[in-house]
Amino acid sequence: MELVFIRHGLSEWNALNLFTGWRDVNLSEKGVEEAKEAGRKLKAAGFEFDIAFTSVLTRAIKTCNLVLEESNQLWVPQIKTWRLNERHYGGLQGLNKAEAAAEHGDEQVRIWRRSYDVLPPVLDPKDPNSAHNDRRYAHLPADVVPDCENLKVTLERVLPFWEDQIAPAIKAGKRVLVAAHGNSLRALAKHIEGISDADIMDLEIPTGQPLVYTLDDNLKVVSKRYL
């Protein structure tokens, strides 16, 4: 069985070196081309999908659409869920990473970005950019909508969707595409690859590159490769 992950193409804020998180920014021109190229690679390699899962953030949705369009599979059903959203970077969202490092120190920012269980500064729920004020999350209980997350909390958010939707689809023989974000995919990779809390700090998933897992019947990773 094979499973394909793709991190969204380079976003406008990626290009500006800003913390993005749950802020809904668009793909950059380069990101659009990355997503299209990913679709072409998947088509050339003969990948066909039965279902696609993505987040409720524009950059991932557009990446999913472009990948499917370029591979002549735009008709494939898509399920969008907040559980596949990027990690919520709290009060860091919208800040320039270099400026944050200058203020707080390189090591502190590295820990906020890459550690498994250290939380970033909290975003005030009354902030105009808080997810509490975004109607795409209006159906969720207020205490479920995050104000900041680390990778541990992100995994706790993502894992129920893996267990309830993605894993059963794979076990049913469906060919699955997951178009999401650097940290939601890192969380899933940690789970399916059995990566330790320490080693996950070093895992980087590049934008717009299809990551193909070969899984056994128990959804354990046999191999992985980038196209």
Swiss-Prot record:
Its keywords, alphabetically, are: Gluconeogenesis, Glycolysis, Isomerase
According to the UniProt entry, its GO molecular function terms are: phosphoglycerate mutase activity
Pathway(s) this gene product operates in, as recorded in its UniProt entry: Carbohydrate degradation; glycolysis; pyruvate from D-glyceraldehyde 3-phosphate: step 3/5
Q: Which domain of life is it from?
A: Bacteria
Similarity annotation:
Belongs to the phosphoglycerate mutase family. BPG-dependent PGAM subfamily.
The entry's function note states:
Catalyzes the interconversion of 2-phosphoglycerate and 3-phosphoglycerate.
Q: What is this protein called?
A: 2,3-bisphosphoglycerate-dependent phosphoglycerate mutase
- Source taxonomy: Bacteria, Pseudomonadati, Pseudomonadota, Gammaproteobacteria, Pasteurellales
